Curated annotation (Swiss-Prot):
Segments crossing the lipid bilayer: 29-46
Cytoplasmic membrane side: 1-28
Protein species of origin: Aeromonas salmonicida
Summary of the function given for this chain in its UniProt record: Involved in a type II secretion system (T2SS, formerly general secretion pathway, GSP) for the export of proteins.
Main location class: membrane
Taxon lineage: Bacteria, Pseudomonadati, Pseudomonadota, Gammaproteobacteria, Aeromonadales
Protein name stated in the entry: Type II secretion system protein C
Annotated GO CC locations: plasma membrane; type II protein secretion system complex
């Protein structure tokens, strides 16, 4: 019974709406909708402008890759500084004169029989006898049977390190306490000697005495001894009574090879002389720079 009543009421409302003139409400409704649309557009515009101003106020920063939770990135220049792009300052080496001046005469029972003092320490050689055994030693070598180490080689002495202090071992026959000889360039000295001998071969006896040695009529070598000027002899690392048996690998005991060796020596700027010393063979390098 309620349904017909509701249907009648709905039909009555629809009939009344049809009688209302829509033109009276269409224009006000249009302006209301336009006003709402303008309000929404204005709000959206202000939001966009506000967002742009916030982004422009912050300075640009590059993106820094890193794990979450890290603090501000810091540029580490330590690796660049360790590259030493401009080189490293060289530490001043201890002067040889100061070492020699502070080195007392050694009490080591050893004898310095020969030296080859070179401007290149790696080529310097000292011939030292200890406990009846003679050997050649370079800088940094320990003398056999001792805790003494060769530190420096000069023309008339050797500085050794023994019991954590420097000591002086003088060349046999040289007096301790004499001034340290000035360190000239051995190559320059040898070059001047070479020029002198080329001009006057007879001057060789000033530096070196050479005498052939024969046993049962057979050539066994050439005996070498210092001349009136023994400095060069000692600098070459030769020892009195050394016997030369070859030059640059050519056997001086063979006549043909000996002649070939002499021809090489005439124009050579360097050579290796093999000498026999107390039953052992030693190579002596001789540089005759032009």
């Amino acid at each position: 019974m309620t349904l017909p009543f509701r249907d009648d009421l709905l039909s009555s409302l629809l009939a009344r709406c049809k009688t209302v003139p829509l033109s009276r409400f269409s224009q006000p409704l249009f302006w209301l909708l336009l006003l709402l649309l303008a309000h929404q557009c204005a709000g959206l515009t202000w939001r966009l402008l506000d967002l742009g101003s916030q982004q422009s106020s912050q300075p640009w920063q590059p993106a820094v890759a890193g794990s979450q939770g890290q603090g501000k990135a810091r540029l580490d220049l330590g690796g660049v500084s360790r590259l030493a792009l401009f080189g490293k300052a060289k530490q001043q080496a201890r002067a040889a004169d100061a070492v020699a001046a502070d080195a007392p005469k050694t009490q080591l029972n050893a004898q310095l029989n020969g030296v080859l003092a070179s401007s290149d320490p790696a080529k310097s050689i000292a011939i030292i006898a200890h406990s009846g055994v003679q050997n050649s030693y370079g800088i940094g070598d320990f003398i056999d049977g001792t805790q003494a180490k060769v530190r420096q080689v000069f023309a008339d002495r050797v500085i050794i390190e023994r019991d954590a202090r420097d000591e002086t071992l003088m060349l046999d026959g040289e007096e301790y306490g004499k001034p340290l000889p000035k360190q000239g360039n051995p190559d320059e000295k040898l070059s001047s000697v070479r020029s002198e001998l080329l001009g006057n071969p007879g001057k060789i006896t000033d530096y070196l005495n050479i005498s052939p040695v024969r046993v049962d009529g057979r050539m066994v070598g050439y005996r070498l001894n210092p001349g009136s000027n023994p400095e060069l002899f000692n600098q070459l690392g030769l020892v009195a009574n050394d016997m030369a048996v070859s030059i640059n690998g050519l056997d001086l005991r063979d006549n043909a090879q000996a002649m070939q060796a002499m021809q090489q020596v005439a124009g050579a700027t360097e050579m290796t002389v093999t000498v026999e010393r107390q039953g052992q063979l030693y190579d002596v390098y001789v540089g005759l720079s032009e």
